[in-house]
């Protein structure tokens, strides 16, 4: 299965809506606190909008989506198109890469706030090396310095005890992005770890080696960061981070 999309991914998302409800509720609660200044929204990595509440999207006058997955645009319209039409929200869906030509995409949408929808944590799977993935993430965040933007993304993921990841009582916590994070050891050496991981891993009984998605320092210092548990599969969980950067 393609980690970043594909028909099997959408089938899994549709099939596991009940199990993912806690994570979706956590994202909704985060977005309820976000009050974008812009009336336009650019969603990069939109997929079918499985975890973004349509009521929040209805607050915009125009929404533009990008995703490399050819199924994303038609399924996004299928899931959200009717209600967005009811709120008179203009919807434009594009199939293609918006990250490589990010500066050009931003210039084409000068008034839009930007939401990276569960894509930054996937870049480690799309680059030949971890160093190249980390460099791409850093380049993306530099491009956003003059733009209102937010992201929900994988921070870490890994195996959990049977039955723990299926709980709807998803772990939720809010913190502030520090200047730096303390180091710990994973399968590829010293990386950064937020202190909230200790509480998260205890609640979900994390097991084995967890994967670092290279996103620990995505947000500028002082950004409120929401930590959300995502029970991706019965024995595998993701720790999501969500934050919004205002101008």
Q: Over which residues does each language-model region extend?
A:
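Charged, low-complexity C-terminal accessory regions
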Residues: 158-247
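A short SAM/SAH-binding and catalytic strip from SAM-dependent methyltransferases
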Residues: 111-130
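S-adenosyl-L-methionine
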Residues: 79-108
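Conserved SAM/SAH-binding beta-strand->alpha-helix loop
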Residues: 69
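Conserved SAM-binding loop of SAM-dependent methyltransferases across substrates and taxa
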Residues: 47-60
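Conserved class I S-adenosyl-L-methionine
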Residues: 37-49
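A short glycine-rich, Lys/Arg-flanked "PGG" loop and its adjoining helix->strand segment in the class I
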Residues: 106-108, 128-149
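Class I SAM-dependent methyltransferase Rossmann-like catalytic core
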Residues: 1-38
């Amino acid at each position: 299965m393609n980690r970043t999309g594909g028909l099997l991914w959408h089938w899994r998302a549709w099939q596991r809506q009940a199990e993912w409800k806690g994570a979706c509720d956590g994202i909704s609660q985060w977005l309820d606190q976000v009050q974008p200044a812009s009336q336009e929204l650019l969603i990069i990595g939109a997929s079918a909008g499985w975890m973004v509440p349509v009521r929040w999207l209805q607050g915009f006058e125009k929404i533009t989506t990008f995703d490399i997955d050819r199924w994303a645009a038609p399924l996004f319209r299928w899931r959200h198109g009717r209600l967005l039409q009811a709120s008179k929200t203009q919807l434009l869906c594009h199939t293609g890469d918006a990250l490589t030509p990010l500066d050009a995409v931003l210039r084409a949408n000068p008034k839009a706030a930007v939401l990276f929808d569960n894509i930054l944590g996937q870049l480690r799977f799309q680059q030949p090396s971890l160093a190249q993935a980390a460099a791409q993430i850093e380049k993306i965040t530099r491009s956003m310095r003059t733009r209102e933007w937010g992201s929900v993304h994988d921070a870490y993921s890994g195996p959990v005890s049977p039955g723990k990841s299926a709980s709807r009582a998803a772990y939720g916590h809010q913190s502030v992005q520090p200047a730096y994070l303390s180091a710990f050891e994973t399968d590829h050496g010293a990386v950064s770890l937020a202190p909230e991981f200790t509480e998260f891993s205890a609640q979900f009984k994390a097991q084995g080696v967890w994967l670092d998605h290279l996103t620990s320092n995505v947000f500028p210092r002082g950004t409120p960061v929401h930590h959300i548990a995502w029970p991706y599969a019965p024995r595998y969980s993701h720790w999501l981070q969500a934050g919004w950067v205002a101008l």
